[in-house]
Structures are given as C-alpha cells and as structure tokens.
C-alpha cells in the first residue's frame, strides 16, 4: 500500500515519507489511520445527509435540491405523503383566488373570487348578481306593501276600519230578530188598502130564500158591488119591522149597506135609502149590479154559475 509507512517509528523519523495526495470521499469509502502503537484501524466514512425540513415553504420558482442516493427513498416517501395530505386538504378547502388568496369559486374559469373577478372585468357567468337586499330597503318595501294593502281594504270595505290582509276576518253571527204577524198589524194593512167605513149607493134585488115548494119563503135583498178592484156581494135578511129595530137599539140607518169605495154609480137609490127617508151622507161608488133574472140587462155583469133566486111567485 503506497503512501502509508510500514516501518518502525525510528525509520519514519529519520526518513520522512513523501506527502500523500488527498483522496476524494467519492473515490474511497474507507480510510486507514495509523495509531501511535503502530497498528492500523479501519474507519468507515459517514455520508453527509442533506438538511431538509418539512415545514419550510418551498416556492414554485425554486429548483428542488438534489437528494443523495441514500436519502432518495426517504425524501421521495416524505414528499408522497406530503402531496397526498395536501391533495386531501385541497379537496376539502377548494382552490384559492390568484389575486387575494381567498377561496375562489369552484366553477370560475379564472380561478378568482367574486370581488377580484368583477374588479378585473372578467365576463364570468359563475359570479351572478347578489340577491341580498339591505335591511333598510327591506323595511321600506314592507311599509309600501302594508300601505297598499290598507288602501285596497279601505276601497273594498268602504269607510270601514283597515285590517291586516293576512288575517282572517272574524265570523260574526247575524243579529236578526224574527218578525211575527199579529191581528193589529193585519188590521193596519187592511186599513191602508180600504177605508174603515163608507156609505155606498147600490141596487138591491129582491129574492126569495127557502124551498121552491114553500108558499111563504123568506124575502131578502141581494146586491154586489166592485170597490177598489174587489167584488163584494151579499144578501140582506129581514130582521123585522122598523119599530122593533129602533126599540132594539138600531134604526134604518144602521142597516144601510156600508161598503168601501169611491166614484159614481148609474144605479138607482136603494130600498134602505127609501125606508130611511133619505137621511145621512151617502158616498156614491161604482157598483157592479147582479141581475138575478135571465133577461140580459145593462147591469148583468156577474160571472156564470152564480145561484139566482127569481122573485116571481109560483102560480
């Protein structure tokens, strides 16, 4: 082995050996060192590990350091773990804005947030106009809607009090009082249509009441008048002599045919008027006279089917 003294210590002191050229660590992996006792010792050279810290930020423009052969596997594995962890974090947090660093919109092709995208003037369809309305404008809008609802309710309900259109109106039972008809009300209704007492001029026809084969039948007078569009007809029965009627509290004037109506009549004076001596105020009214005889006359205006009694006695 050239370059190493193999002799004793005296020989080395008297004849010094020539200097040994330096050996590069890559050319020799081990060195032999001589001790003072003359023996040799083999020493393995330790490789220098590159200094690397996982928490140091490395920029994209910087070139990565060249790892040694021994630490290539460990650095590559650490980088793989770091890249996988970073990929998981990137998937959860999304992409960052290229200008401000805030979170960018996922579908934005410019990889920027809404503020930076709008400030740069990019025509991005992802960043639409915000629909958020300030509280002051929302309050003003609510007041306008309430005023419109109140005006609509006032227009629909007339002068009634305004109410909230969202509330349901309260159902109020109708306070109706049932009306009952009494005799007094009916009398008032009849009195409004016809006068209470009227003396009328009419024609009376003498008729016989009783069986046909009876010689002495009851004599009565029959008449009919039309007052106010209504036909009134009836038969006046014999109640006895006038003296008895006066003694009983009545007179001939009490048996006048009192009807309701007005107007004039072409008929003759009644038999009761002749008996009473023409006393009392007589109200002339239009009268429809019933003719009991089969001979047609100017006053035969009664409908067919009315029972008539002829005044001719049987032979």
Swiss-Prot record:
Summary of the knockout phenotype: Significant reduced tiller number, enhanced culm strength, increased panicle branch numbers and reduced grain size.
Biased composition (Low complexity): 70-82, 143-156, 172-182
Residues that bind Zn(2+) 2: 97, 113, 117, 124
UniProt key word DNA damage: no
Intervals of motif Required for homo- and heterodimerization: 227-230
Disordered, as annotated region: 1-24, 64-92, 143-186
Pfam families assigned to the protein according to its UniProt record, in alphabetical order: DUF702
Sites where the protein binds Zn(2+) 1: 97, 100, 108, 113
Regions of compositional bias (Gly residues) in chain numbering: 1-10, 83-92
UniProt subunit comment: Forms homodimers (via C-terminus). Interacts with SPL14/IPA1 (via C-terminus).
Protein name per UniProt: Protein SHORT INTERNODES 1
């Amino acid at each position: 082995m050239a370059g190493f003294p193999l002799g004793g210590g005296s020989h080395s002191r008297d004849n010094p050996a020539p200097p040994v050229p330096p050996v590069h660590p890559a050319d020799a992996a081990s060195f032999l060192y001589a001790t003072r006792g003359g023996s040799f010792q083999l020493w393995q050279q330790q490789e220098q590990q590159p200094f690397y810290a996982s928490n140091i930020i490395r920029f994209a423009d910087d070139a990565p350091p060249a790892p040694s052969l021994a630490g290539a596997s460990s650095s590559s594995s650490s980088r793989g773990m770091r890249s996988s962890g970073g990929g998981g974090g990137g998937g959860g947090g999304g992409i960052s804005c290229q200008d401000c660093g805030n979170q960018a919109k996922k579908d934005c092709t410019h990889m920027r947030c809404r503020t930076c995208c709008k400030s740069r003037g990019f025509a991005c369809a992802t960043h639409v106009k915000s629909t958020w309305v300030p509280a002051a404008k929302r309050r003003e809008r609510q007041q306008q809607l309430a005023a419109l609802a109140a005006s609509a309710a006032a227009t629909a309900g007339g002068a009634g009090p305004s109410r909230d259109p969202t509330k349901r109106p309260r159902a109020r039972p109708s306070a109706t009082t049932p009306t009952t008809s009494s005799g007094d009300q009916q009398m008032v209704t009849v009195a409004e249509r016809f006068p209470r007492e009227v003396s009328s001029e009419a024609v009376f026809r003498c008729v016989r009441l009783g069986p046909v084969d009876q010689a002495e039948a009851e004599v009565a007078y029959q008449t009919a008048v039309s007052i106010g569009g209504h036909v009134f007809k009836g038969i006046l029965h014999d109640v006895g002599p006038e003296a008895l009627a006066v003694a009983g509290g009545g007179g001939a004037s009490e048996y006048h045919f009192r009807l309701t109506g007005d107007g004039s009549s072409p008929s003759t004076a009644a038999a009761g008027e002749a008996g009473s001596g023409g006393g009392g105020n007589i109200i002339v009214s239009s009268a429809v006279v019933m003719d009991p005889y089969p001979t047609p006359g100017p006053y035969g205006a009664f409908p067919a089917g009315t029972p008539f009694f002829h005044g001719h006695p049987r032979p």
